[in-house]
Design a protein with these regions (language model features):
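Catalytic cores of alpha/beta
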Residues: 133, 193-206
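Core AdoMet radical
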Residues: 51-71, 75-98, 113-126, 142-170
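Structural recognition of alpha->loop->beta junctions
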Residues: 45, 107-113, 202-206
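Short, surface-exposed connector motifs at secondary-structure boundaries
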Residues: 110-116, 183-186
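N-terminal [4Fe-4S]-dependent radical SAM core
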Residues: 1-64, 70-85
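Conserved strand-turn element in the central/C-terminal portion of the radical SAM core barrel
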Residues: 149, 155, 180-198
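Generic structural signal for well-ordered alpha-helices
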Residues: 65-72, 101-106, 130-134, 171-174, ...
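Acidic (Asp/Glu)-rich catalytic clusters
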Residues: 75-79, 105-111, 131-143, 175-179
Length: 206
């Protein structure tokens, strides 16, 4: 972070970690979310589209290898990147059979991939998935990171946006993940209509 910036940019953090520009490659998997199938709710979060949250997202009709190759080619050429993070982004990526989870991760092992990021919900963090990630990290030498959707610490706002969990589940998930040493990225939506400035500050504190 330079003296003129008020926060540490994610892109700067990646440059410091890997020594050069790094871009995320989204991987679209045929999965779903417990907030859609009735396990903890229906309809999903109010901000989530039919494909789950996503950017540069290709159809999951493509194989994982084809999604990876196409986006590495496109993003690498457009932004001059040579290193990439394979990003399991849409829906809840620890809400699938464990063997499928392991296989999908193996399919993104690629010479240009330096990290695998798993996006999920705080209430879907289970030991067997964390153990599988640790085993694969040790086996492949690739970094594994986990991205948790919190969105806000305000319980009433969480209810309004139909998240289906509260702050307690998030804190429990962080403690579980920390035992394995994985880096955690927290997703927040600032200035939701039901939040105020105090909520935004409390988000940052948490």
């Amino acid at each position: 972070m330079n003296s003129e910036e008020l926060y540490n940019k994610y892109s700067t953090n990646l440059k410091q970690k890997y020594g050069e520009k790094v871009y995320k490659i989204p991987i679209n998997l045929p999965t779903t979310c417990p907030n859609r199938d009735g396990t903890c709710g229906v309809g999903g979060c109010i901000f989530c589209g039919t494909e789950g949250a996503g950017f540069e997202l290709l159809s999951n009709k493509y194989s994982i290898k084809k999604q990876l190759d196409k986006n590495i080619g496109y993003i690498g050429k457009r932004y001059g990147a040579k290193k990439f993070i394979a990003y399991f982004q849409n829906f809840t990526n620890t809400y699938m059979p464990i063997e499928d989870f392991k296989q999908y991760i193996r399919e993104v092992i690629h010479p240009s991939v330096v990290e695998i990021a798993i996006s999920t919900r705080p209430d879907c963090i289970h030991e067997e998935y964390l153990e599988a990630l640790q085993d694969l990290e040790n086996e492949t030498g690739l970094r594994m990171s986990i991205e948790l959707g919190l969105q806000t610490i305000n319980y009433h706002t969480l209810s309004k946006i139909n998240r289906g969990h509260g702050l307690a589940e998030f804190l429990d998930a962080v403690l579980r993940i920390k035992k394995y040493g994985f880096e955690i990225c927290t997703h927040l939506i600032l200035n939701l209509p039901w939040d105020n400035q105090r909520d935004v500050i409390e988000n940052a504190k948490v």
